[in-house]
């Protein structure tokens, strides 16, 4: 078992997610490549400055445009939206996800009114789609179910959601962020319209549970696998599956200095670890534009490397996404984003876009105690803010939320 340094640990996680040492994907094709590299892209409807998924792709794809995601997913049929935690996954994975969908159908739903929608309702919804074509929740009438759901309270809406979760319908596109559904056979490319054998699906998700995290703690790997296949995975089953992966030469165990946790890595990614430990950047990670030392990256709220406590574990950086907290309970701000400089998180800012005046307001800015305060960082911050403003269409910037006087003055000059 090899042991890697903490620096290698965080660089590997960032690099595997396509965030370091800079953007190595470009344009529309690069958008698809980035999502494949990420193993999946979490989607969120909130649009304070841009949606989380758009910010995630801005951080990985040079010349990313807001329309690229929907083009890659819905026009090119490269990805599908799925899950209680809404993600976009490569279309090639759909046959494996049919196992998850099968277990969803067996377990049913957890509404007070029903666990499985009435057969007559299912038949009605499917017939409407078949005869009328792609439809959204708003295209159906119907009675409200006596159980609140943010997905829609109409019976037809819940039936649509159920059919989507069991794989009978798919999201064919979106109006804004509203889902437009259609029958699976009219959305899914025919070469992927089959059910992978259960053993193959479990093997696939066993590997994906490692690839998704880059370096996965053994306990986290088991939890991820259980989510992917939508059933409990016992300790005994987990142990057998893991030992098989190791015996087959698919995965290995890794130690991180200073950590008691055991980690897993795919053997196909081992060369990257070796390069990083030797102080070299893997050739496959070569940036197509400025590096993160030359231009900071604003990280999306739902980034895998920072979400769910990983910011603290990996970077010793406290991060909370506080959009659902009352104002008086927020520590930082409504839509605060971490700032990546080099291979570390050094600051956070709370942005807001005024779409009437096309002004990006920085409502708050917080540097870490050990963050650099030199001209190189200030220049990288200016470059990062400029690219972010271009992404969201901001023509002006209001920097009054930056309380560091010298830094604010420098940025004003650079961003004229």
Where are these regions (language model features)?
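Long, charged, low-complexity, helical-prone intrinsically disordered regions
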Residues: 1-416
